[in-house]
Amino acid sequence: MGKLIMWNIITLDGYFEGEKSWELPFLEIVWGAEMESFSLAQLNNADYLVFGRITYEGMAAYWKTAEGEIADFMNRLPKIVCSRTMDSADWNNSTLIKENVAEEIAKLKARSNKDMYVFGSANLSETLIKENLFDEYRICVAPIIAGNGRYLFSKGLPERKLSLISSEQLKTGGVIAKYESLK
């Protein structure tokens, strides 16, 4: 069975996007050869990419026409989009889950040989945190205090104890921390 892994990039003060959806200027700060290598390693070990609607729409709009090794992975890998409001998912290899999201993700996880990655998707991530489905959290902290935006984790989530697996400092100043969920 593969693991369900959250992957996100946040600012030092905890924001994963600006005040507007897809406002992500801090990504440029941490992106470089190391982050590209890290991203490719994750994609190479993925059975599925899992998104909420907003992240799915943004990712699809970008990656459908992008070129390069990461784009090839993003377009080739099976994608799961969890949304009650979408009627279809047209990005290559996409499957739409409209109901019983946690139950359906748990079933996919049980059948997976490799890992499943949730990128962005704060609302979906909250659902999966509440259901205690994440096995691992991978967070890259960008060396910037944004001062405002949307927090990755909202108030009122249940406590989840974690254990640090590893941390890696990037030449860009970012730090990737990997935490295991202590279910």
PLM-predicted stretches and their roles:
Residues 1-183:
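Enzymes that bind and transform nitrogen-containing heteroaromatic metabolites
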